[in-house]
């Protein structure tokens, strides 16, 4: 067997270059030896087209006839990039598999066709990995509004990939475990992230799909092992197809791949990979504490009268940025009238500039909430912009929840958004935008004669280009990625943007598992967690709400101007604790001593680990005293927040930490662990 070994700093890939299709038969940590159980069973590329389907016919995206017909032509190594080129002589199809060495590996497929013919693709994988076995546990996450990052673990063999005891005279099992997300909310139902842990060896594989629209992955069984298939939109799941000609090639969405020995080592590797693919700008180094007036505070009803005392109070506790959230652009009900983004004269009788100037006067940077991709059906802008500026189906504008949706392929749509952002930056010195997205597109647009799914793919890619151009024009601008909380929490967006809203959840007790699980999907230095203490609540309730924000990017809200001096001192202490973690945050990797949290866990723990120091955040969500044990390297414990605490006790027995919460109500703590 002719083998090709190729490595990134942390990962080694092994390909079989034999007489059949190229196969990716090994994915391992670069520091680990070659496996002796390489199984060259699954082609590297799976591709379907009209007239070229599957054999046997199933719902799976493997066993494609075109994938089986591809043959190795050559490979090219240039710097940190590997390109493996395969052709199908019968159709003229050429597929190039591209691999970029980052921390792990980033990969995608490029398809083209030679000659005068055409080929209508209905599926093209970004990457397919051959697995030695499907006797494995899958860690994956459901994601929905106010209930984000809900991780679970399942045994593939016992739950979805039943062992049918196939022999040589029968086909292999045709079942699969599919995970799919549809529409423009890339994380509206599921996260595009997974970890597969082998049940018999210390081996684990992790991945993420980096697209801000539809995606699909599936795991299934082959005759002598299994496969992991990663892709963007498909015809079967998303109404996607595209016509290849000699002049119109196609590239899939990128994916990332890492490996480790267990769950936490893989999530640590994914964390390093996310840092490696991020387009970090000098302004990202600021990592400011942002106060936002929305959550459990003004709730979309800002006025000069309400904002000025909040601004003064936010400055007093030490916020760096002050973001005015929804409502600043409308006198009353605004949902289906948005689009002009002009300040309301009713809310701000002396102009929005009076409020913005107060923010500037305290040395804070002003921010505004904006929902750039929608135009309300009752907005004057809906009549000023041409139909070409909007997503359409059969010539009719797509309308969802009282909004039209801009098509960012359109010059008119981009010009409208450019003029809006440039005006707000120029007139008010805006340095921060919270870009929200509360309306889904459905399957897409057929404008230009494309399939619905391909029209959506082109729009989502145009959105990314618009964001890139915007940040090039405004290099000091920070942008928060929000879509009804975290409904678009993907690394097409987050490779570019500064901050991710992790939820719209209003209950601190329910925010705890969201905060704790977030680093499995997003970098801790990008995870914007609401901390919204409520004046008049008990000290433990107040503390709990603040703890939620500390192990990430604390996103402050609450009626600070109504709080007592004691409450404000506790907020200052929380911000000091948070800033101490910020000094190290972009080097720390996550681990979960009690496992990834479920939605109903009483005890939850997140550890952010460095070489010598860890920050351990622990939540106890039920009333009354309780005790929990954690397996951790024995370390010195210092209370990090709150710094003065006698209600929780800590006892080491070898490498087991016993924590007792002696409180009559739910409580939470952040600890600093120093290894000797």
Question: What are the functions of these language-model segments?
Answer:
Residues 2-221, 238, 642-650, 659:
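Polysaccharide-binding surfaces and accessory modules of carbohydrate-active proteins
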Residues 10, 109, 247, 291, ...:
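Conserved, mostly hydrophobic/aromatic
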Residues 288, 299-301, 345, 372-423, ...:
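Active-site-adjacent "subsite" loops/lids of carbohydrate-active enzymes
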Residues 463-673:
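Active-site-proximal substrate-binding groove within the catalytic cores of carbohydrate-active enzymes
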């Amino acid at each position: 067997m002719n083998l090709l070994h190729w490595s990134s700093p942390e990962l080694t890939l092994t390909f079989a270059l034999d007489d059949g299709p190229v196969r990716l038969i090994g994915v391992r940590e670069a520091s680990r030896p070659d496996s002796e159980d390489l199984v060259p069973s699954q082609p590297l590329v799976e591709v379907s087209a009209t007239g070229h389907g599957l054999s046997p016919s199933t719902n799976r995206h493997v066993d494609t006839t075109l994938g089986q017909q591809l043959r190795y032509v050559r490979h090219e190594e240039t710097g940190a990039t590997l390109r493996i080129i395969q052709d199908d002589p019968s159709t003229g199809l050429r597929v190039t598999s591209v691999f970029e060495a980052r921390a792990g590996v980033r990969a995608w497929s490029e398809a083209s066709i030679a000659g005068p013919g055409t080929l209508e693709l209905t599926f093209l994988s970004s990457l397919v990995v051959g697995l030695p076995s499907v006797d494995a546990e899958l860690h994956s996450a459901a994601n929905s509004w106010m209930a984000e990052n809900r991780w679970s673990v399942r045994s593939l063999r016992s739950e979805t990939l039943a062992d049918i005891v196939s022999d040589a005279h029968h086909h292999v099992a045709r079942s699969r475990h599919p995970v799919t997300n549809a529409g423009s909310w890339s994380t509206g139902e599921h996260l595009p992230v997974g970890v597969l842990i082998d049940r018999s060896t210390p081996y684990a594989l992790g991945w993420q799909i980096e697209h801000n629209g539809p995606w699909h992955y599936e795991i299934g069984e082959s005759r002598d092992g299994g496969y992991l298939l990663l892709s963007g939109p498909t015809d079967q799941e998303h109404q996607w197809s595209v016509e290849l000609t000699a002049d119109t090639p196609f590239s899939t969405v990128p994916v990332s791949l890492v490996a480790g020995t267990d769950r936490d080592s893989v999530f640590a590797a994914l964390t390093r990979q996310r840092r490696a693919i991020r387009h970090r700008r000098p302004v990202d180094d600021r990592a400011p504490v942002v106060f936002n007036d929305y959550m459990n505070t003004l709730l979309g009803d800002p006025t000069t009268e309400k904002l000025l005392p909040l601004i003064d109070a936010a400055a007093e506790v030490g916020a760096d940025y002050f973001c005015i959230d929804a409502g600043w652009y409308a006198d009353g009900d605004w949902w289906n009238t948005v689009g002009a983004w002009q300040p309301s004269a009713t809310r701000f009788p002396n102009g929005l500039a009076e409020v913005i100037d107060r923010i500037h006067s305290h040395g804070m940077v002003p921010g505004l909430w904006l929902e750039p991709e929608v135009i309300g059906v009752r907005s004057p802008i809906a009549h000023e912009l041409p139909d070409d500026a909007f997503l359409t189906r059969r010539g009719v504008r797509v309308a969802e929840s009282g909004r039209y949706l801009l098509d960012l392929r359109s010059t008119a749509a981009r010009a409208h958004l450019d003029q809006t952002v440039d005006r707000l930056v120029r007139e008010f010195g805006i340095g921060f935008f919270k870009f929200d997205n509360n309306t889904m597109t459905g399957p897409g647009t057929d404008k230009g004669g494309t399939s619905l799914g391909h029209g959506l793919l082109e729009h989502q890619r145009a959105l990314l280009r618009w964001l890139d151009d915007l940040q090039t024009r405004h290099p000091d601008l920070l942008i928060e990625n929000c879509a009804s909380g975290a409904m678009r929490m993907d690394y097409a967006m987050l490779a570019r943007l500064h901050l991710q809203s992790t939820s719209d959840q209003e209950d601190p007790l329910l925010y705890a598992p969201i905060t704790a699980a977030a680093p499995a999907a997003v970098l801790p230095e990008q995870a914007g967690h609401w901390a919204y203490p409520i004046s008049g609540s008990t000290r433990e309730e107040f503390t709990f709400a603040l703890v939620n924000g500390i192990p990430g990017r604390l996103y402050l809200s609450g009626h600070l101007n109504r709080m007592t001096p004691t409450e404000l001192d506790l907020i200052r202490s929380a911000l000091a604790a948070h800033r101490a973690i910020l000094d190290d945050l972009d080097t720390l990797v996550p681990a979960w001593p009690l496992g990834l949290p479920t939605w109903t866990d009483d005890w939850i723990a997140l550890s952010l680990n460095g070489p010598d120091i860890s920050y351990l955040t622990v939540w106890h969500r039920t009333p009354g005293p309780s005790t929990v044990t954690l397996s951790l390297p024995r370390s010195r414990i210092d209370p990090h927040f709150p710094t003065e605490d006698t209600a929780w006790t800590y006892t080491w027995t070898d490498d087991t930490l016993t924590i007792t919460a002696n409180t009559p109500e739910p409580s939470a703590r952040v600890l600093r662990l120093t290894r000797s």
